[in-house]
Amino acid sequence: MTLAVKCPILGFEETKNMEFSTIDEVFVRLKSLDGKDFSFVLINPYLIRPDYEFDIPTYYQELLSLTPESNMKIFNIVAIAKSIEESTVNFLAPVVINLDNNTMAQVILDTVNYPDFFQADQIANYIKK
């Protein structure tokens, strides 16, 4: 599915369209469609952190035309390491997708309001051993 980027991923401001695809039951991929060959691996945060909760700021709600009835998905960017346990998740800047109009935005959360969210939180912190 092609997504229109309404608020880009930090550092990739020139990207306006991305392809969304499922890798498996845990991970998905966002791939640039604007001539640059790069992609991001994302994770459904609720699979590893069921208590993950935040309010989407009004600015982003309007940008994505979100309503309480919107078919919306939340994902977080993963920095892949040699092992999945060493890989990190950015809980401070989730990617919000509105499936009703195929738009997406990276939402930057305020660290003051979300002191337990980090940019590089190891997946190992959330895997039960």
UniProtKB/Swiss-Prot annotation:
Record family assignment: Belongs to the FliW family.
A cellular component term, taken from the record's GO annotations: cytoplasm
Species: Campylobacter jejuni subsp. doylei (strain ATCC BAA-1458 / RM4099 / 269.97)
Annotated keywords: Bacterial flagellum biogenesis, Chaperone, Cytoplasm, Translation regulation
PANTHER family assigned: FLAGELLAR ASSEMBLY FACTOR FLIW
Main location (coarse class): cytoplasm
Protein name, entry field: Flagellar assembly factor FliW
Record HAMAP family: FliW
Subunit structure: Interacts with translational regulator CsrA and flagellin(s).
Pfam name, any one: FliW
GO process terms (BP): bacterial-type flagellum assembly; regulation of translation
Stated role: Acts as an anti-CsrA protein, binds CsrA and prevents it from repressing translation of its target genes, one of which is flagellin. Binds to flagellin and participates in the assembly of the flagellum.
Recorded coiled-coil stretches: none
Subcellular location(s) per record: Cytoplasm
